[in-house]
Amino acid sequence: CHFWVCP
């Protein structure tokens, strides 16, 4: 995850 993005 990175801030509001969870790929």
Curated annotation (Swiss-Prot):
SS bonds (residue pairs): C1-C6
Keyword field: Disulfide bond, G-protein coupled receptor impairing toxin, Secreted, Toxin
An annotated Gene Ontology molecular function: toxin activity
Tissue specificity as recorded in UniProt: Expressed by the venom duct.
Function statement: Cyclic peptide that displays a 100-fold selectivity for type-1 angiotensin II receptor AT1 (AGTR1) over AT2. Interacts at high nanomolar range affinity. Binds to the extracellular side of the receptors. Shows a competitive antagonism mode of action on AT1, blocking G-alpha (q), G-alpha (i3), G-alpha (oA), beta-arrestin 2 pathways and ERK1/2 activation.
UniProt miscellaneous comment: Negative results: does not have effect on endothelin type A (EDNRA), endothelin type B (EDNRB), apelin (APLNR), vasopressin type 1a (AVPR1A) and vasopressin type 2 (AVPR2) receptors.
Domain notes: The cysteine framework is C-C.
Protein name: A-conotoxin cyclic Mila
Species in which this protein is naturally found: Conus miliaris (Thousand-spot cone)
Highest classification ranks of the organism: Eukaryota, Metazoa, Spiralia, Lophotrochozoa, Mollusca
